[in-house]
């Protein structure tokens, strides 16, 4: 065989193999995500609408295509739970008061009451979704918070419920040198007692790549929050200082939602929920996000 012919053949074979791998990768990414079958909406997205007309708002959520809702609290959500179920939507997850988890004195629901109600409703997940100021600024404070979460996680486990921690962006701020609060949480939270509900928006605006973070948490993520971040948004650790227009509908921002759902499946996440904290039209926004996600891979 002539050298030129050999080189040409080798080059063609290499190119064919490369294209084949690229095509397989594209096909894998383009597949309909399994999460669409159970896609949820975190009801914080439509909090104001729920106060105005609970039944109408929940019907709009169901009509948009969502299969379940994630509640903002357990105690006090009896009406939402009942109406969501009547509309054929599932309710498998709910946030809990962070003050209750940390044992802060005040008019906060008791953990035993939260777990008892969650068990009666057959919830699968409870979400510890925030750490207030004064409980997150140092390594020791974050360790104490994680210890409280582990204690609550044991209580949840006894009831057949999984606890998970939902991040914002403050956790990604360094608390000791290069060590961030999130680093401490990853080290201190017992995976058997408290997993993560990773919010990809807050991770990214906190300076962490959502995909890399998900892979770093392989086997430790039970749920994922899907929300998009405006292209070019700056890192911001104070969630109250994030501009309202930084929150985008899924597909309109800088986060690759198809890749997020693909990697979520790879790392063992059980389900996903759309959430958009700020929007001039929450009903329209949540419907647009579902339409985009449902169109991926079609």
Task: Enumerate the predicted regions with their spans.
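Acidic (Asp/Glu)-rich catalytic clusters
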Residues: 29-35, 59-63, 77-93, 110-122, ...
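Acidic/histidine-rich catalytic cores of soluble enzymes
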Residues: 158-254
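N-terminal export signals
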Residues: 5-25
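Active-site acidic/histidine proton-transfer and metal-coordination neighborhood
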Residues: 11-12, 16, 101-195, 283
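Hydrophobic faces of well-ordered beta-strands that scaffold small-molecule active sites
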Residues: 37-42, 69-71, 91-96, 126-128, ...
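Acidic-and-aromatic substrate-binding clefts and catalytic sites of carbohydrate-active enzymes
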Residues: 47-51, 68-80, 98-109, 133-137, ...
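C-terminal segment of N-terminal export signals and the immediately downstream linker at the start
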Residues: 21-56, 60-63
């Amino acid at each position: 065989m002539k050298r030129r012919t050999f080189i040409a053949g080798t080059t063609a074979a290499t190119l064919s193999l490369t294209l084949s791998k690229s095509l397989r990768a594209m096909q894998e990414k383009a597949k309909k995500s399994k999460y669409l079958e159970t896609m949820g909406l975190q009801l914080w997205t439509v909090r104001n609408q729920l106060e105005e007309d609970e039944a109408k708002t929940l019907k709009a959520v169901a009509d948009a295509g969502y299969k379940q809702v994630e509640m903002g609290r357990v105690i006090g959500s009896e009406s939402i739970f009942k109406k969501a179920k009547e509309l054929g939507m599932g309710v498998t997850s709910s946030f809990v008061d962070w003050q209750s988890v940390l044992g802060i004195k005040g008019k906060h629901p008791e953990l035993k009451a939260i777990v008892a109600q969650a068990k009666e409703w057959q919830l699968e997940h409870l979400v510890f979704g925030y750490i207030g100021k004064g409980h997150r600024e140092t390594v020791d404070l974050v360790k104490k918070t994680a210890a409280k979460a582990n204690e609550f996680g044991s209580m949840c486990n006894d009831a057949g419920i999984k606890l998970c921690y939902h991040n914002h962006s403050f956790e990604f701020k360094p608390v000791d040198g290069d060590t961030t609060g999130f680093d401490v949480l990853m080290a201190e939270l017992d995976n058997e007692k408290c997993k993560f509900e990773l919010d990809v928006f807050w991770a990214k605006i906190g300076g962490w790549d959502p995909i890399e973070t998900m892979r770093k948490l392989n086997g430790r993520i039970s749920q994922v929050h899907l929300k998009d971040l405006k292209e070019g948004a700056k890192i911001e650790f104070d969630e109250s200082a994030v501009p309202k227009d930084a929150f985008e509908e899924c597909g309109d921002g800088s986060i690759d939602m198809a890749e997020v759902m693909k990697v979520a499946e790879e790392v063992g996440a059980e389900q996903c929920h759309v959430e958009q904290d700020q929007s001039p039209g929450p009903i329209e926004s949540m419907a647009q996000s579902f339409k985009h996600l449902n169109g991926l891979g079609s």
